[in-house]
Amino acid sequence: NMFEAMGIWEKIKEASTPINKIHVSEKGQFGFSHICSKEQQVEALGYVVINRVLGEVMLSELENKENIKMFCPYEIDSFSERQTDCNISLKPNDKKKSKIELTSQLLIAASGADSGLHKLLGINSNVINYHQDAIIGNVMTAIPIENRAFERFYSEGSIAFLPLANNRSAFIWVLPNHKSEIMMNTSNNEFLEMLQKEFGLRLGKMSDLGNRVKYSLSLTRALRLHTKRSVLVGNAANGLHPIAAQGFNLGLRDVATLSDCIYEEIINEEFEKNIGKILNKYSAWRNPDHEKLTYFTDGLVRLFDSKSH
């Protein structure tokens, strides 16, 4: 566990909800798939962590590190590579503050799929637009979800339910662009009625709808993972459809692999000399995992999309 190695897992675990059972079904079909943590002989199949809590824990850890300096809120305005280092210009969000010029041996971009940093680095991406959106929110359910996760496929998309604290459930509702626009503009009661209709009564009657947000869905894959002095990790390297819920885990593996590659050269006191070697090794180790998971995720999306036509 990477968070255990960082010494922050216990804080994250306190605010997380374990998933012990996963139930996958398709509307209108009799069969379903069921996975249990006991059968798999693991403590949990996964954990649901509130993004805000995860961010707070990690931010607190960063603030306590004397060798880490944060510039926030700033964004990268320009980037240039030289033979021995790179130059990064930071632009403040606050107009009263001045630009900051940084010189570094390496830039690690963990900026997400849509940050625009790819263009500054000169890295192109392949993008597949699924013409779908994900609406994310939370509800109360009459039947407690009790550490179970559900994924329900139907003719136009899918609905996933994940356990939260206090008998609340998070949902991720994937649906076509034109339908998502309609659903975002409905009243809470109308939204709950449609959500209930597509998911069914497995968790009983739904109520007390929280805030909902919408994200467009696509597959984004960088055509290369690094330049001479910059490297991509997480969604900056691959932005996946949430159908398999593997995007965050893929990003964690990127960070763990890059850390190992860097650490190996640091202990040999050859980091500055071997940056090219580090980045080539990182790409060689990560590309097979990226390729396998992007093809798998894209295949699932296309499989269920073909069933809807």
Identify the function of each model-found stretch:
Residues 260-309:
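C-terminal helical "tail/cap" subdomain of flavin- and related membrane-associated enzymes
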Residues 83-84, 145, 251:
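Pyridoxal 5′-phosphate
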Residues 3, 93, 99-101, 106-205, ...:
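Conserved FAD-binding catalytic core of PHBH/FMO-like flavoproteins
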Residues 182-275:
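FAD/FMN-dependent oxidoreductases across multiple families
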Residues 35-42, 175, 297-300:
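Short glycine/proline- and charge-enriched loop/turn segments
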Residues 51-55, 132, 136, 191-192, ...:
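A general structural signal for well-ordered alpha-helical segments in protein cores
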Residues 1-19:
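Glycine-rich FAD cofactor-binding loop and adjacent beta-loop-alpha segment at the N-terminus
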Residues 15-120, 128-133:
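Conserved N-terminal helical subregion
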